[in-house]
């Protein structure tokens, strides 16, 4: 199929001498270039308490990017699922879709750094992070659709409807970072897209 290019912009801080302000303005400039150059999408991630980047909430970055770009799709690369409650994730994603006028795509992963796990969900390992991701991802469309009650291993809540609802029909496309055959199977069976390149090194995606 057609190879479409995406930019993975992680706001890497190569030197401690770089201020956070400079890091962010460089990020915006890079994204403007990607948009003007006709790239399909810009993906930006979620990290906490790590010196090399400043991206605690990709939705914030994406809403700002929407004001600096015109055509490019804007994706979370990636949401770290186990750090989110499903209702909060569905609502923030839908609000972002609204604010970006329907340009949002959602990449979801279990996360990769024990540094973050230890600080945000103490005691959680990669296996349980994967289980949380597989529980949370399918709830999004159900919450956007509305009147969805959930009784899972990690989350339980009574009938809930996301407020707001996204403006894209059926919600923003959902991508699963498939680092193993399990997540690949999971993505296909839930009608999600598969992000095959490891997100920290990939620059293109195959569609």
Where are each of the predicted segments found?
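Internal, glycine-rich beta/alpha segment that forms the wall or movable "lid"
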Residues: 2, 85-192, 204
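Conserved beta-strand positions in the central sheet of alpha/beta enzyme cores
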Residues: 6, 43, 105-107, 195-196
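N-terminal beta1-alpha1-beta2 module of alpha/beta enzyme domains
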Residues: 1-76, 169-172
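Active-site beta-loop-alpha junctions enriched in small/polar residues
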Residues: 10-12, 47, 79-81, 109-113, ...
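Short hydrophobic alpha-helical runs that function as membrane-insertion/retention elements
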Residues: 73-75, 194-197
